[in-house]
A protein has these predicted regions:
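Structural microenvironment flanking redox-active thiols in thiol-disulfide oxidoreductases
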Residues: 47-87, 98-105
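Sec-dependent N-terminal signal peptides
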Residues: 4-12
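The canonical Cys-X-X-Cys-His
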Residues: 43-46, 114
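Short active-site neighborhood of thiol/selenol oxidoreductases, capturing the structured segment around
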Residues: 29-44, 156
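Second-shell loop/turn segments in exported
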Residues: 40-42, 69-74, 139-145
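Loop/turn elements at helix/coil->beta-strand transitions in domains of secreted/extracellular proteins
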Residues: 31-34, 63-66, 90-92, 111
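Thiol/selenol-based redox catalytic cores and closely related redox-interacting motifs
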Residues: 99-181
Length: 181
């Protein structure tokens, strides 16, 4: 039986386009892992991470979980989000969070920022990792040729195996999420 993540009920912009969620309650089976990635259509760091985010999505989906891409900037439309997904080859579900319900629930500060959730034996959700997707960027404008550390991949693998994660938070590098007034 799926359990609900009670603090996260999201009321989102309605959309006829498949893949853009109208409403979603985060829920999962015991031992399942879900990933939330905060993103923006115009953040160059988030866009550079798109291929890795898609690879993580496929891996999480193959393990029975979900990856949700959350667009956080005010003024984004379903059309913007769908065009962005198409342009970058992203196939996961997209959430438009212009009211920052998710941003506030997870205290997200930049895009891209990832949250890995593991559902325990009772189906109760627990954040097991939050922060950097990988180490492709040391800081804005300071990009490696390729990532050498894959923090979200490692957290997902550890969560699936119910193993401890050595570092549950890594300060993310990216475009600052402007707080709602």
């Amino acid at each position: 039986m799926k359990h609900l993540w009670c603090i996260c009920v999201f009321f989102l912009t309605s959309c006829a386009t498949k893949g853009i969620l109208e409403t979603h309650i985060l829920q999962g089976e015991p031992g399942e892992v879900d990933v939330i990635v905060f993103s923006s259509t115009d953040c160059p760091i988030a866009n550079a991470m798109a291929p890795e985010i898609e690879r993580i999505h496929i891996s999480v989906q193959n393990a029975g979980g979900d990856l949700f891409l959350v667009h956080v900037w005010a003024g984004r439309t379903n059309i913007d989000a769908q065009k962005h997904a198409d342009d970058y080859g992203l196939t996961m579900e997209v959430i438009i969070d212009t009211e920052h319900e998710l941003v506030d629930s997870f205290n997200a500060t930049v895009t891209p920022e990832a949250v890995v959730v593991l559902y325990d034996e009772d189906g109760t959700p627990k954040v097991i990792y939050q922060g950097l997707v990988n180490n492709l960027f040391d800081s804005p404008g300071n990009r490696r040729d390729e990532a050498t550390q894959h923090y979200v991949r490692d957290a997902v693998a550890a969560g699936i195996k119910n193993e401890a994660i050595s570092t549950s938070y890594r300060a993310p590098t990216g475009c600052i999420i402007e707080q709602k007034q």
